[in-house]
A protein has these predicted regions:
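Preference for intrinsically disordered or flexible, low-complexity segments
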Residues: 17, 22, 26-35, 43-50, ...
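Generic helix N-cap/helix-start motif at coil->alpha-helix transitions
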Residues: 2-12, 39-45
Length: 288
């Protein structure tokens, strides 16, 4: 007899498949996941493995199945083998993101403020995108020689080999000035921004991102866009912006099909941007 956890999972899975992972279906799966995580019932944990797997929390799915799975069962052993490969190669890094509510976005801003993270107009959430990482022990910034608990991990183009930069030295422009460096190639940006100060802010005072090829920055409404993160088609659907990013004269029909087939962390990678003025979402894409 099918238990209630499995019945609910099948309903949510069907909704997720039929809507191609739209924001409501992803949010419903996350709510279900969070409830199951508080439940000690073995049947709930068995279904939680399926939810983790569907949302691409591969490491979490593997770890939990290792704990509760019957290793005398051939199906369980086969699934463990498949999940192990994904867990080792992907971890939970490419999990489908939970669409954030306005309240959650505000809490994230408050957390960044508590950490003392400067505001970057063109890269508003650099901790979430991975441009910065946190260190409990602290790391010495190469530029100011002060200990920082948040340090830069994305590209910095300079003659000298710089390992660690703190957010303050990036925001002030001191890192770019001291090392005659930049965080973004000034030729790899969209046209249409006439204000040289905006270009200076982008390349000298904004954390960059890591692309497969040369990183490229989108622009709209006469200004550079905010970089929101790394995405594939599933993430674009989860954010509810897939159709919006396809409505872009940058891409021909063949390229639009490629965007719809892109996979975060895969051979064809997309990068999500948003206009600071009208709110339109745009992507850049490249290959490994």
């Amino acid at each position: 007899m099918m238990n209630e956890y499995l019945k609910q999972y099948i309903t949510l899975q069907k909704q997720f498949r039929e809507t191609k992972g739209n924001p409501d279906s992803v949010r419903a799966l996350y709510d279900f996941k969070e409830g199951l995580e508080q439940n000690e019932d073995k049947q709930a944990k068995e279904v939680l493995v399926d939810v983790y797997d569907l949302l691409d929390y591969k490491k979490s799915a593997y770890d939990l199945l290792c704990q509760i799975g019957d290793r005398s069962d051939k199906k369980t052993l086969k699934r463990l083998g498949t999940l192990k490969e994904y867990a080792e190669n992907w971890g939970n890094h490419y999990a489908i993101p939970k669409p954030k509510t306005p309240e959650e976005k505000q809490k994230e801003k408050e957390r960044q403020a508590q950490l003392g993270l400067p505001t970057f107009r063109y890269h508003p959430d650099p901790l979430d995108t991975g441009a910065f990482e946190e260190s409990e022990e602290g790391i010495v910034c190469d530029c100011c020689s002060k200990t920082t608990h948040i340090y830069y991990t994305a590209p910095f183009f300079s003659v000298e080999d710089i390992e660690h930069l703190c957010p303050e030295c990036i925001a002030s422009g001191e890192a770019a000035r001291k090392y005659s460096g930049s965080f973004q190639d000034d030729y790899s940006v969209d046209d249409g921004v006439d204000d040289p100060e905006k270009l200076d802010e982008l390349i000298h005072r904004t954390p960059g991102y890591s692309g497969w090829q040369q990183e490229y920055w989108r622009a709209h409404c006469g200004d550079y866009c905010a970089f929101l993160g790394y995405v594939g088609a599933r993430e674009l659907r989860a954010h509810g912006v897939l159709e919006e990013v396809l409505d872009d004269p940058m891409w021909d029909e063949e390229q639009k099909e490629m965007i719809q087939e892109s996979v975060n962390g895969g051979h064809l990678q997309c990068y999500l941007f948003q206009c600071l003025h009208c709110g339109k979402h745009l992507v850049w894409m490249d290959f490994d």
